[in-house]
């Protein structure tokens, strides 16, 4: 066939080589066009939607008021008995017989002793005042613990995802008690499904209250940036929904079979007054302990909470490659 083609007459100034080059160019253009047309579809299939529940406030706790009650009984204000007020010591000196039977030397010694007591009292008062000032400074900028737990579960844990979706729709994230309930329910949802656990990690740190909000937001933004879109969000009682989901917990027309997405990743970030010491996660028992510790934070200590999960919508995927590239700190449990 090639010999026959080569024997075919060609117009002048046209060679078989030029024909071959032009044909190759056409094929390349066709391949590029095909790639441009179908690449968005592939990207849509790799879309990672995310859900978010949370809120909080990093206000300093109110410090107890410091009050000073004056001496009772009128010891220093009873008429003109003490001549000009002050500490009122003149009445002590006659008692010891100043200028009388005990002689002047003993009275001088008593005066020196009293002066020493007064000086020490003034010094101690100044020292305690300074210490009180330091205590006030510490109480106005107390220590805050910030902790994060991440759990990678099999994609077949649809009941867990449904619980998180429903929690996002019903949670009161604008109050301390409501946020405490979110933390408890999210940790309970994970603790109830250990059969789906595959990966886990935990980290905790402590900072002063003045730096806590920035540290907390940095952690939250790092995790939220891994989503292509937040399709369900309830933050500080601001509820937002979007995307393809037709019903919370229901199947959408684009739903994929169980296991096709491979994983669900849940992140819980909390900030609380005091220490938050979580054990390093190397197995399922340590992951369980970390979840129980985090879920046990009382509402009066909890400052802020973020519960994040991906994928949120049916049809979106989180593959093993995504886990390796986006969540390298995770460990098999």
UniProtKB/Swiss-Prot annotation:
Keywords: Cell inner membrane, Cell membrane, Membrane, Thylakoid, Transmembrane, Transmembrane helix. Coiled coil: none annotated. One of its GO terms (cellular component) is plasma membrane-derived thylakoid membrane. InterPro entries: DUF1517 (IPR010903), FLAP_modulator (IPR053023). The keyword Cell membrane applies. Disruption phenotype: Inhibited growth under dark-light cycles. Altered PxcA- and PxcL-dependent H(+) efflux/influx activities under fluctuating light conditions; prolonged light-induced H(+) extrusion followed by slightly decreased H(+) influx activity until light-to-dark shift. The double mutants missing both PxcA and FlpA or PxcL and FlpA have both reduced light-induced H(+) extrusion and later lower H(+) uptake activity. It is found in: Cellular thylakoid membrane; Cell inner membrane. It comes from the Bacteria. It holds the Pfam family DUF1517. Its main location: membrane. Residues 58-70 have a biased composition (Low complexity). The keyword Transmembrane applies. Belongs to the FLAP family. PANTHER family: MYELIN-ASSOCIATED OLIGODENDROCYTE BASIC PROTEIN. This is Protein FLAP1 homolog A.
